[in-house]
Amino acid sequence: MTSLTLALDAMGGDHGPHVTVPAALRALKSHSSLKIILVGDKTEIDVYLRQAEQPLLSRIEVIHTDEVVSMSDRPVHALRTRKNSSMRLSIELVRDGRAAACVSAGNTGALMAMAKVLLKTLPGVDRPALVSCLPSVTQKPVYLLDLGANISCDSETLFQFAVMGSVLCEAVDKKSRPKVALLNVGTEEIKGNDQVQQAAQILQNTDQINYTGFIEGDEIYLGNVDVIVCDGFVGNITLKTSEGIAKLLVHQLKRGLTQGFFVRFLAKLIAPRIQAVLSQMNPDHYNGASLIGLRGIVVKSHGNADETAYLQAISLAVTEAQRRLPEMIKDRLESILLDINN
């Protein structure tokens, strides 16, 4: 790939440089043309760079700051007062063109507020959306948005989310005409509130979006559609509930496989298969939520992500930057609006 630079908020998340720096080094090993700017406390960062190979160090830059956005900071407070924080400086690197994308595991609300103010939304986009992919029984990812950036949305905003989600799926998975659905309380045309009903009407009349209709919550993981659209209130609860169920299933499976000698013996025989199933259910395997609809790329990692999970978020940022995701969304929106106006 051509040379690409990412900005990492090295201090963000529960583990800070203990996770972000080793993950950055692993990303550099995987992508020979990648450069990374680590933003944070240089003293702490250097601890994890001491044993790194020189060829990797030559592709790392450290920008020092000892200011951090805490998980308890309110978004408005962080925006007004944390002007030299590792999170803000990372986003500013994207704004100023020094980095193609930013990755942070820090305070989600603060990240969204800073990104929206510093990067601005694309033409035709009223609000950015937070989107991530979920597993499915067909082994293909399903994209769900919005995950909490916008608690309530009107029909036009839901329509914009559908367009952005469709373009994201095309860009990341190289999927032609992804299937898009609206999350609803039923699949019948009469079901749903006014916002969902009106969004459905707009999508039905938009040829450039492969809209398939409504989808219910029990169909999310079947893999029958590629993109599922809802407001941030519904999306966030759906995501958190899904993660909780995954943890419950993993716990119950592990508990069941340790009860009794014969069961433990069988568990050892099928251990590789069990591990593969557990891996598919692990939310860390799908770590990385994209804040789309902005003039730059911002990827949010889980705050408690380990090194491998954080690496997944970095890889997502690399892919979106390579595909020039903001430009793709901008072009598609312009094309759709042109069709509607004609």
From Swiss-Prot:
Pfam family membership, one: FA_synthesis
Catalytic activity: a fatty acyl-[ACP] + phosphate = an acyl phosphate + holo-[ACP]
EC class of the enzyme, as a word: transferase
Keyword Lipid metabolism belongs to the record: yes
Domain of life: Bacteria
Function: Catalyzes the reversible formation of acyl-phosphate (acyl-PO(4)) from acyl-[acyl-carrier-protein] (acyl-ACP). This enzyme utilizes acyl-ACP as fatty acyl donor, but not acyl-CoA.
Subunit-structure text: Homodimer. Probably interacts with PlsY.
InterPro entries: FA_synthesis, Phospholipid_synth_PlsX-like
Pathway of action: Lipid metabolism; phospholipid metabolism
Protein name per its UniProtKB record: Phosphate acyltransferase
Cellular compartment(s): Cytoplasm
GO cellular component, one term: cytoplasm
Record GO biological process: fatty acid biosynthetic process; phospholipid biosynthetic process
